[in-house]
Amino acid sequence: PVWKNIFNVCAVKEFSSCADDYPMSVHVLDVGKADCIFITCEGKNILIDAGETSIYKFVNEYLRKMNIKAIDQLILTHQHSDHVGAMSYIVDEFNIKSFMMPQLKDDMIPTFRSYERLLISLDNKGMKAERPEPGKSYDIGPMKIDIFAPLSQYDDMNNNSIVMKVTYKNKSFLFTGDAGKESERDIISAG
């Protein structure tokens, strides 16, 4: 789509022109119709989603080329395969300091293989998923993550997406996962 090309051109120009003198960088990885966003700032790293399973090698190589060994905050915005796919490999290959994903109703818990592998990988490392709390903030080095959603456990998986703002100094980025209209209305109503 045209908007994607415009965003890609603007993002490349903006981030490449300030990368040398601005310590925060946001990398929106091209993983097709999936999501994978890497944020780094002053030695602290955040990875939001991990695309489909098939792109694991690409994500792994990308992070290795940047000399990344640890991820301070790994975030699964919601439990659809185009967000969780390669995440178990990330957990296995990197030092993950904290992991966050939304709580789901029992009848919505996925049974697809990549999600089950993620749970096994977390268990093998003795990690538990932290549940996002709207209104709560997390400090990741000089960056701050403010959680806006999910405000409820919804019947639509996309509406269970973690919606967050990542801020460094006077710059902030809003990440919405695949939150839909119901979640958006609730965020606006909550103020």
Region roles according to the model:
Residues P1-G191:
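Non-globular, low-confidence helical/coil segments that flank catalytic cores
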